[in-house]
Amino acid sequence: MAQQTPLYEQHTLCGARMVDFHGWMMPLHYGSQIDEHHAVRTDAGMFDVSHMTIVDLRGSRTREFLRYLLANDVAKLTKSGKALYSGMLNASGGVIDDLIVYYFSEDFFRLVVNSATREKDLSWITQHAEPFGIEITVRDDLSMIAVQGPNAQAKAATLFNDAQRQAVEGMKPFFGVQAGDLFIATTGYTGEAGYEIALPNEKAADFWRALVEAGVKPCGLGARDTLRLEAGMNLYGQEMDETISPLAANMGWTIAWEPADRDFIGREALEAQREHGTEKLVGLVMTEKGVLRNELPVRFTDAQGNQHEGIITSGTFSPTLGYSIALARVPEGIGETAIVQIRNREMPVKVTKPVFVRNGKAVA
C-alpha cells in the first residue's frame, strides 16, 4: 500500500490525478501539466515535497563526519543557515544520492535526501555515523511545500508573520532559517526563485489552502519534471546512480578536491576517473517535430572520424521553449551536433550545455 503525505486530501480536493511515485501517492497533475509548468515560469506554483526525507544530525563531531561522508566540503559552511548541494558517494565513486545539507551550528546540521533512496540513504548514513557518535533524527513529523516562481516569495510571504518576514528578508539563495514553526529555505528544483518550507504535519493542510487562496497554483510531478529538466537539474536514477560517477553527471563542481588531505568516501576512485576521463553530461536540442525521450541512443563522429554512441538520460518537450530538449550522457569528443535515432528516423540535434532555461528565459 502506497504511503500518503499529510496533504493527500488537499490534492484530491484540488482535482489531482494521483500516481504511485516510489511508494508514495503523489499528484501527477491537477488537470493541465502545461498550465502548471507555465504558472511556475511566469507567476507562482507549489509542489508537495513531503515525501522527501529530512534528517537532523547532532553531535560535536558532525562537521567532521560530513566532511568524510560527502564529496562536497561542509567546511565551506560557516554562516548559520547556509546550505550546499553534494553527492553522497560509494567507495567506487558512484552516486548513492544527491542531497542538500544545511549548517545551523557546530553540533547541528540538516540533510534533505530523496524519497526513492530513503532506506538506502538512512542505512548508509547510520552505518558511517556510528564511529563519530552522531545522533540521527528522521523528521517524519514535518511536511514540505516548495513554492516556486517569480512571484512565489512575495505570495508565500503573505502567510508569514512579522518575525518570519523579517527572518527571510534579503535571504540569499541556498540558505534556510527556522522562523517560528516554519523552516524556510531559498532552494528549489525549477530554476526559479522561491522557498521550500518545512512545517509540522498537522499545519500543512491549512498552509496549503492558504497558499491556494494567495494565488499559488498547485503543481504535480509532471510539471516538476519538465521544469527541472529545462533548468538542467539531475534526477536521481536517470542522470546518476550508484554505477555513475558524478564526473559523468555534470556534478564535477560539487566535488571539493581541496584540501588535498581531506579523505572522503569515493575520493580515491574519483581521482582515478579524473585522470583517465569519463563520459560527460550534455544538453540536446531538437527544433524539428518529435520528442527526445529517455534511453534513446545518441550517435556522433569525433574529430578523428571515430563513431561513438551515448544515451539520453532525460528527454521531454519544453513548454517554455516550444521544442524538444534532453540531457544525454555521451563519450568525450562530441562536437556541436549529433544524431538521435527516433523509431526508424535519424534526427539531427544540437549539442548544448546541460541547462536550457534560467529565471524564465532561454539560456543561449
Curated annotation (Swiss-Prot):
It catalyses: N(6)-[(R)-S(8)-aminomethyldihydrolipoyl]-L-lysyl-[protein] + (6S)-5,6,7,8-tetrahydrofolate = N(6)-[(R)-dihydrolipoyl]-L-lysyl-[protein] + (6R)-5,10-methylene-5,6,7,8-tetrahydrofolate + NH4(+). InterPro entries: GCS_T, GCS_T_bac, GCST_C, GCV_T_N, GcvT/YgfZ/DmdA, GcvT/YgfZ_C, TrmE/GcvT_dom1. GO terms for biological process: glycine decarboxylation via glycine cleavage system. It comes from the Bacteria. GO terms for molecular function: aminomethyltransferase activity; transaminase activity. Signal peptide: none annotated. It is an enzyme of class 2 (transferase). GO terms for cellular component: cytosol; glycine cleavage complex. Its EC number is 2.1.2.10. Keywords: Aminotransferase, Transferase. Belongs to the GcvT family. The glycine cleavage system is composed of four proteins: P, T, L and H. The glycine cleavage system catalyzes the degradation of glycine. This is Aminomethyltransferase.
